[in-house]
Design a protein with these regions (language model features):
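Phosphate/pyrophosphate-binding active-site segments
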Residues: 1-2, 278-381, 485-489, 495, ...
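Active-site diphosphate/adenylate-binding microenvironment
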Residues: 8-11, 16-19, 26-30, 34-39, ...
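Thiamine diphosphate
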Residues: 99, 106-119, 125, 390-531
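Cofactor-/ligand-binding subdomain signature composed of acidic, glycine-rich
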Residues: 1-18, 143-201
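N-terminal cofactor/phosphate-binding cores enriched in small/glycine residues
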Residues: 3-84
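Structural signature of the thiamine diphosphate
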Residues: 22, 66-74, 79-81, 89-96, ...
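Glycine-rich, acidic loop regions that bind phosphate or pyrophosphate groups
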Residues: 89, 100-147, 234-338, 443, ...
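Glycine-rich, anion-gripping cofactor-binding loops and their flanking helix/strand elements
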Residues: 64-65, 81, 211-286, 394-421, ...
Length: 531
């Protein structure tokens, strides 16, 4: 009979899936569910040892002999008793997995018996420490990732998995349970082997590469060639050949869902992509990351390739250009059609008389295409960068998407402009601009910095957050409603200033911004209608 606890069953299955078959078991009530299910599974060679200090060293000896071992202890100071063995394993680089049962989080520091702050207790002497606390939403995928992170790190030394559990009396017993057997494979190839390429182009029927925010130093023809053979969803923050896809993803038909996602880079601006792309139950997710981080916004990860984005994409490019058996799939053709429809939809949504943030960005990008000088374009977070993902084509976009805060966007562009002779443009919303106005308080700034300020006198993105329309205090306390303009800021800092309050003034202002010669920065402030 097994205890029916998802965390326990997931841990039991993954220990076996990662090749750990020798487990030292120490007595206790809090860890009884883990001990019972490990023994009951008959997948492990089990060693009962009462003294945790001795048990830790016995686990070390087993690891020295067979390669890997685990030890399971109960809650409280039992965990600290294994510390001497863990320290020794750390400096020997031996693979020892320490599993500690723990009281629920609400019992810690509440004078409940046999409790202490267990999570992090061994941090100085383990390669990875995880805590299987309960979170809102999908606990299983969250716990799966944490356990896999720890067990992958175990290849380089000891790790600690802390498992908060209820009283054993609160968990029922059943005859059979599902033991998780889906590890995350860590692959560190020097080249893209033939079998990997075959799996990408022939094993999967609907392969898709998703590229988040990152710096990829590859020529544009690499991306454009790859797009002929494989569907790529990317944003201009990482790929100058990116195609707009937000409207496609929001109404995505099942035939456009991938069965293999290859995820590269950091966060994506498009919010809906994560849940929608992973909607198909058979979707696998591979991660390409030189640091081998188990990171996936798709709530699933099956394999990690320890390659840089440049190395992986360049080797994929070499594969499609050298092999004659790789041809565009129907999936690629379906997505190409969807891209064309989305581009037309975005174009049709812009009116010549319209003065909106979208029309400003669209006109700016259209005129920028005609410029013959070198340039770099920064977009501030929030509405500005979301518009960039719709209307930018043919150049890279810079944006602080590491944490996605609005602070420092203008200062980042200013710093960029100070270190180059090229033109640097920054498109920003009003809250980002006024929050970071001291970026312009700098006598060393040159005339190569040009700013487009989209001023609708509040955080416009809050108008589109579902649920906030019911908030009676949205305008006053949430969206930062104000009546400020940038004229005074520009005057006091010797910055050129252009005001635009109509569509015609906006278009003339953008032409001036792109062509006027000056030795100081210029700000074009476009006053937009407020909702």
């Amino acid at each position: 009979m097994f205890y029916d606890n998802d965390k326990v069953n997931l841990l039991t299955g993954l220990l076996k899936a990662y090749g750990i078959t020798h487990v030292v078991l120490c007595p206790g009530s809090r860890n009884a569910m883990i001990v019972n299910n490990i023994v009951e599974s008959r997948l492990f060679t089990c060693y009962p040892v009462t003294d945790e200090r001795s048990a830790g060293f016995q686990a070390l000896g087993i690891a020295q002999n067979v390669g890997k071992a685990a030890i399971v202890v109960t809650s409280g100071s039992a965990l600290l008793n294994v510390a001497p063995a863990v320290v020794e394993a750390y400096y020997q680089r031996q693979s020892v997995v320490v599993v500690s049962a723990d009281r629920p989080q609400e019992d810690i520091d509440q004078n409940v018996g046999q409790t202490m702050r267990q999570y992090g207790a061994l941090d100085n002497f383990v390669k990875r420490s995880v805590n299987l606390t309960d979170a809102l939403g999908d606990n299983h995928s969250y716990h799966h990732r944490l356990v896999c992170e720890a067990l992958c790190a175990c290849n380089f030394g000891p790790v600690h998995i802390n498992v908060p559990l209820p009283n054993v009396t609160e968990c029922r017993m059943v005859e059979n349970v599902h033991l998780e057997n889906r590890p995350v494979d860590l692959v560190v190839p020097t080249t893209l082997q033939t079998d990997i390429a075959d799996e990408i182009f022939f094993g999967a029927k609907r392969t898709m590469i998703v590229i988040g925010n990152c710096h990829i130093s590859l020529p544009e023809h690499v991306f454009s060639t790859l797009r002929q053979f494989i569907t790529i969803l990317s944003e201009p923050l990482s790929d100058p050949t990116a195609q707009p896809f937000e409207g496609i993803v929001e109404n995505l038909p099942d035939e456009l869902l991938p069965d293999l996602i290859i995820y590269i880079g950091g966060s994506l601006v498009c919010r809906s992509i994560h849940s929608r792309l992973a909607a198909a139950s058979d979707t696998r997710v591979w991660r390409v990351d030189a640091d081998c981080q188990l990171c996936s916004p798709f709530k699933r990860i099956d394999r990690v390739y320890g390659l840089s984005a440049e190395a992986f994409l360049h080797q994929l490019y070499a594969t499609v250009t050298q092999r004659t058996d790789i041809v565009p799939s129907p999936f690629v053709k379906s997505w190409d059609k969807a891209f064309r429809v989305e581009r037309q939809r975005l174009s049709d949504s812009i009116s010549d008389t319209d003065l909106s943030a979208a029309s400003v960005v669209n006109y700016f990008e259209t005129q920028l295409d005609d410029m013959f000088y070198n340039y770099h374009v920064h977009y501030a977070n929030s509405t500005a960068v979301r518009l960039a993902c719709r209307y930018v084509s043919g150049h890279k976009v810079y944006c602080n998407r590491g944490v996605n805060g609005i602070d420092g966007c203008l200062s980042t562009a200013a710093g960029f402009s100070a270190s180059t002779a090229d033109m640097v443009f920054c498109v920003t919303g009003d809250l980002s601009f006024f929050y970071d106005q001291n970026a312009l308080w700098n006598n060393n700034l040159k005339g190569n910095l040009r700013v487009i300020l989209l001023n609708d006198h509040h955080g416009g993105i809050f108008d589109r957050v579902r649920g906030l329309e019911q908030c009676a205090h949205r305008d006053t306390f949430v969206s930062g409603r104000h009546s400020a303009d940038a004229r005074g800021i520009c005057t006091q800092n010797d910055i050129g200033y252009i005001a635009a309050k109509t569509a015609d003034e906006m278009r003339l202002g953008i032409v001036r911004l792109l062509t006027e010669e000056t030795n100081r920065p210029i700000v074009l402030e476009v006053t937009l209608k407020t909702s």
